[in-house]
Amino acid sequence: AAECGEQRSVALGAAGMDGDVPFSPGWADWTQEEREHEARRLYEQAGYSPERPLRTEIRFNTSENHKKMALAVASMWKQQLGVVTTLVNEEFRVFMQNREQRTVTEVFRAGWISDYNDPYSFLEMFRTGHGRNDFGYSNSTFDALLDQIGTERVRARRERLMFEAERMLMSDHVIIPVYTYVTKRLVSPQLKGWQNNVMDHHPTRHMYKLKLRAAAAPKAAEAPPPAEPSVPADEERQQ
């Protein structure tokens, strides 16, 4: 993912969205060694060990990038914890069917591109019974927060409510954020009216193209006019 410019993510929302109050879990500031130590402690606390490893699977729809990501995750889990992971690659239609029907309850890949410039677009998917809630997440306190966000008109209070909702979601460990998508655009310097934005919306009615003038060719140096022929003094007197 890093090869394509994607940005590392430790929470749900996309940075830069209107009304976003960035949430960062406490471990985000830990060193890699501290994270690995805590992961091993929690792994053992859950009853797993090298002799009794966790066995799980990661499902992903067909894509070379998704495959690379799944391989990397499985490798790190194996190296640090001893987790035995089976990778399952499925055609998109089958993958979505298994995900939506929750016939499989192991780890699966998921991604979302917001419909509008508001963090609520990400949060609402986790409401109990929501059509996009393939995770099966259900938390009445979280649902109540979403209700408050939907009716709150004071911007600062609404932002705080969204922050609390994201904090709750991350505390419940519903998802493991990996990276945030980015868009890559090559824009001509002649194109004006283009404005980079988090939604990647670019109405052409606001754009225009400058016509660059061709550089004028340098003029040839003008030679001075020929000098008048000199007349001898004797001839000048005779004239």
Label the model's feature ranges.
Residues 1-6, 44-49, 75-83, 100, ...:
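Sec-exported extracytoplasmic/periplasmic mature domains
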Residues 2-45, 63-68:
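Structural transition elements
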Residues 4-8, 17, 62-66, 92-94, ...:
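Solvent-exposed loop/turn segments at secondary-structure junctions
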Residues 5, 27-35, 61-69, 87, ...:
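Extracytoplasmic/periplasmic, Sec-exported soluble proteins
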Residues 17-37, 48-51, 98-103, 124-151, ...:
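Short, solvent-exposed loop/beta-turn-alpha elements that line the ligand-binding surface or hinge
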Residues 34, 38-41, 65-72, 76, ...:
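Extracytoplasmic/secreted proteins, especially bacterial periplasmic and envelope-associated proteins
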Residues 45-62, 108-111, 153-189:
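Bilobed periplasmic-binding protein-like "clamshell/Venus-flytrap" ligand-binding domains
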Residues 76-127:
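Periplasmic binding protein-like
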